[in-house]
């Protein structure tokens, strides 16, 4: 089932999401719906707050990106970045902030502790695009959006567009949730 994407200015995007204590069939169904919704919106990452749920769950699927065509969707639960290395700037966008793209400086490599779709604990290292997308989605779990990381002059450039989105002037090819709907029960 395709779920509507929560848009900029909705309060759930500004909250620190709650950890999951386990996973059951309802979470498995949710994960499938998140993957379907992300693909429908032509995204490569989606965090639970982006569908109105305050839970520490995210999905990454780089397969639409050239060079990553064989990538499988990755489920990340309760992530915690243990270490970072190097920094670089790269253009980012976000399904919750349609039509805005800007360069964001982030660590180029991370060591991540998380639980997978079977709720098994893992510690892995990620670099390049995967590290960037994971950090972007983890930020969603912490109530941070990529526009919060922009330098002042870049933020000024997109401010009017952000105000338009907050006012509901949004045009997307995917369904969006009503703004300020609040978090749904997890």
From Swiss-Prot:
Organism: Prosthecochloris aestuarii (strain DSM 271 / SK 413)
Superkingdom of source: Bacteria
InterPro entries according to UniProt: Peptide_deformylase (IPR023635), Peptide_deformylase_sf (IPR036821)
Role summary: Removes the formyl group from the N-terminal Met of newly synthesized proteins. Requires at least a dipeptide for an efficient rate of reaction. N-terminal L-methionine is a prerequisite for activity but the enzyme has broad specificity at other positions.
Alphabetically ordered keywords of this record: Hydrolase, Iron, Metal-binding, Protein biosynthesis
Annotated gene: def
Entry binding sites for Fe cation: 94, 136, 140
Catalytic activity from the UniProt record: N-terminal N-formyl-L-methionyl-[peptide] + H2O = N-terminal L-methionyl-[peptide] + formate
Cofactors that this protein relies on: Fe(2+)
Similarity-based family: Belongs to the polypeptide deformylase family.
NCBIfam families per UniProt: pept_deformyl (TIGR00079), PRK00150.1-3 (NF001159)
EC number(s) recorded for this UniProt protein: 3.5.1.88
GO molecular function: metal ion binding; peptide deformylase activity
GO annotation terms (biological process): co-translational protein modification; translation
Protein name (database record): Peptide deformylase
Keyword RNA-binding: no
Textual note on the cofactor: Binds 1 Fe(2+) ion.
Active-site positions on this chain: 137
Class of the enzyme per the UniProt entry, highest EC level: hydrolase
Keyword Nucleotide-binding: no
